[in-house]
Amino acid sequence: IPISYPFIFVNLGKQKPTLKTLQTYFLSKGLPLQAIESITESFQTKQLDKGEYFVQEGRTSKYMGFITQGLFQYYYLKDGKEITTYVTGANAFLLSLSSFFKQAPSLENIRAMTEATILTIHYDEVMRLKKENEAFLAFYIAALENLVISMDDTRTNLIILSAEERYQLLLKNEPDLLRQIPL
């Protein structure tokens, strides 16, 4: 769920720095520490090089990621041209929604724009956590609600705002994002 939040620093023991980032994120969402520890056990650290794909068109998305470092581009190919639909960075979840939830081939590509570090969790683990961990289920539902709201806002903005107005909104809501994108 691509939403950035400020960090809070809490002593989470001797975890890997990337795992601490995810734990801090979950703490900021109000999940209890015991639930967070059992949730984050299911995540694995993955390094991606610039240009490496997290999801490729035609392949089924088996993993959801949490970005601890780096930028990612969501795009479609149309007539051989890349059409970027979204760019996201640290402290955001990363997934091809339709492919992940339907477990069907993806229509989009998600590619690292910079060297990146992500934490990944397999689809089966997400489904298991939804059944076994009430705190995760509550987080999952809230995240999906926020995603639906964000998608509705995007749809509305595409209809009622000009390209210039959408660009100004991007500058207002994500002032650092454009500076981070490599040219």
Report each predicted region and the residues it spans:
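Short, flexible turn/loop "capping" segments at secondary-structure junctions
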Residues: 46-48, 148
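Cyclic nucleotide-binding regulatory domains
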Residues: 27, 52-114
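Short, flexible segments with low predicted structural confidence
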Residues: 25-26, 36, 81-83, 97-101, ...
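Polybasic "coupling" helices that flank or enter modular domains
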Residues: 111-183
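Short N-terminal helix-initiation segments at or just after the protein's N-terminus
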Residues: 9-17, 52-62, 89, 128-131
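Cyclic nucleotide-binding regulatory module and flanking cytosolic helices
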Residues: 9-44, 99
